């Protein structure tokens, strides 16, 4: 089984390009073994990380994602007090 995750980010305007470059690099790191496919989409002032991964790797890969987020949080605007710096959506991929 595979999981599809879409994570929304809203970089501060002065960090937009730097954040996109950093996210692109992070997604392509070799230790992200569970990733089957990935994309970065931009729309208006938001950046979307779209990742397909093996369900068995979801938990460990999510931990790496949180660690990464902690290094770039200063580049991001908060959406609100609940979601903070990301709006994530993950579910089972129907193939």
Locate predicted features:
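Short, surface-exposed ligand-recognition loops at beta-strand->loop->(often short) alpha-helix junctions
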Residues: 9-21
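An amphipathic, aromatic/His-enriched active-site/gating alpha helix that lines ligand/cofactor pockets
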Residues: 25-37, 53-87
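Non-catalytic surface loops within mature trypsin-like serine protease
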Residues: 11-13, 54-56, 91
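A short beta-turn/loop motif at secondary-structure boundaries
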Residues: 40-45
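Short, low-order "capping/linker" segments at domain edges
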Residues: 87-95
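Short, acidic/polar N-cap/turn motifs at the starts of alpha helices
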Residues: 6, 37-38
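Short acidic, gly/pro-rich beta-turn/loop elements at beta-sheet edges
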Residues: 17-19, 50, 60-61, 94
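Active-site-flanking beta-strand signature of metal-NTP-handling nucleotidyl enzymes
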Residues: 3-9, 49-51
């Amino acid at each position: 089984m595979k999981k599809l995750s879409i994570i929304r980010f809203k970089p501060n305007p002065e960090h937009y390009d730097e954040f996109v470059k950093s996210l692109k690099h992070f997604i392509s790191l070799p230790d992200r073994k569970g990733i089957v496919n990935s994309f970065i989409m931009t729309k208006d002032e938001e950046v979307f990380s779209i990742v397909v991964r093996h369900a068995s790797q979801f938990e460990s890969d999510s931990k790496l994602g949180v660690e990464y987020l902690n290094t770039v949080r200063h580049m991001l605007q908060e959406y609100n007090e609940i979601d903070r710096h990301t709006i994530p959506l993950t579910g089972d991929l129907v193939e």
